Amino acid sequence: FQQPADCPDFSSRLQEQQVCLERVTSSDLGLSGTIQVRNVAFEKQVSVRYTFNQWESLHEVCARWHQSIPAKNGQDQVDVFTFFLPVPPFLLQLSTLVQFAARYQVNGQEYWDNNRGKNYTLTCQTHPLKMPRECEESWIHFI
């Protein structure tokens, strides 16, 4: 999927849903990302619910507050939260799907960004590491 923050309707989706995934990146350890929420109240909880097996079982991680973005153009102040989803190494070799959605709880209400009902979905893949040509004949890789 395209990074949500790069979509032209990102601001309108945030206003409509109250919560919107901003960006996600992957590494060998898992997925990291940012979520924007409308600052409706001081007390709030942001989390990411995810699964590796088509929602037969699920996991949830709390996101942490990162920064506030001041109100502009008549839109409310926005808070940015960060999250990390650990991906077990054994799953990386199975081309497993990781599906997730962002959850925002505030003022007794619950709001979701689940990619318009499709969930955000990534496929775990491994990529062979290629040694730089200048290192191929170096002794350093034997140490």
Regions found by a protein language model. Give the residues of each.
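Glycan-association/targeting regions that enable binding to alpha-glucans and other polysaccharides
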Residues: F1-I143
